[in-house]
Amino acid sequence: MPMATTIEVADYTNIMPITVSITVYLGVSIGIDTSTTGFTCFSRY
């Protein structure tokens, strides 16, 4: 059990930064896409 919990904690600490970085990266990419499309639509008018 101690070994399993240690591995679980290690996996959790390793996975969390990766998921956070992926979420931030996707959020920034989506934000850039929406801002650029909104800018082009706004410039058309």
Curated annotation (Swiss-Prot):
Q: Which Pfam families does the record associate with it?
A: Corona_NS4 (PF03905)
> What high-level taxonomic lineage is stated for the organism?
Viruses, Riboviria, Orthornavirae, Pisuviricota, Pisoniviricetes
Family statement drawn from the similarity comment of this UniProt entry: Belongs to the coronaviruses ns4/ns4.8 protein family.
Q: Which organism is it from?
A: Bovine coronavirus (strain Ontario) (BCoV)
User: What is the official name of this protein in its record?
Assistant: Non-structural protein of 4.8 kDa
